[in-house]
């Protein structure tokens, strides 16, 4: 609880420093193509976080992780009703996402297009969501 109180106080007293330090500590887990110039900027009514920085959520979820964790489980699926339990490694998930992304592109879906997925909770559903993010579909 003491650590929480210290972090809360730091965030309250100097939020820009707090978020900058937190982001710097997360550099091993979040790849930035370009580092930010400003942590936070508020020009009412607009505000920006990590202004000038460039990262990519799809890249961070798989491309960056597969380099370090290729054979580690990326997703573990459990369905007690069907008595199913299986997992997929980062390498396997990366391959599946690339196949789904290719299929989406082949169907004419491009950056900015809206995609509706109606799938059961599964590894394939997660892979399809990541594939949409990978090609920039919404």
Q: What does each of the following model-derived ranges do?
A:
Residues 43-54, 80-88:
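Acyl-group handling in specialized metabolite and lipid biosynthesis
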Residues 136:
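Structured binding elements
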Residues 58, 75-129:
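Conserved AMP-binding/adenylate-forming core of the ANL superfamily
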Residues 12-34, 53-76:
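A short N-terminal helical cap/helix-turn-helix that marks the beginning
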Residues 133:
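Anion (oxyanion) recognition and catalysis
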Residues 11-12, 105:
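Short regulatory alpha-helical segment in sensory/regulatory domains of signaling proteins that mediates
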Residues 4-10:
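Adenylate-forming
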């Amino acid at each position: 609880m003491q650590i929480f109180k210290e972090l809360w106080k730091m965030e309250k007293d100097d939020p820009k420093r707090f978020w900058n330090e937190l982001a710097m500590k997360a550099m091993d887990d979040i790849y930035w193509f370009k580092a930010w110039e400003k942590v936070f900027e508020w020009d009412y009514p607009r505000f920006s976080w990590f202004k000038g920085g460039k990262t990519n959520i799809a890249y961070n979820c798989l491309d960056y992780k597969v380099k370090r964790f290729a054979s580690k489980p990326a997703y573990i699926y459990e369905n007690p009703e069907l008595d199913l339990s299986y997992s997929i490694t980062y390498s396997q998930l990366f391959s599946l996402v690339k196949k789904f992304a290719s299929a989406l592109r082949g169907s004419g879906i491009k950056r900015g297009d809206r995609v509706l997925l109606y799938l059961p909770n599964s590894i394939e559903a997660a892979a399809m969501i990541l594939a949409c993010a990978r090609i920039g579909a919404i």
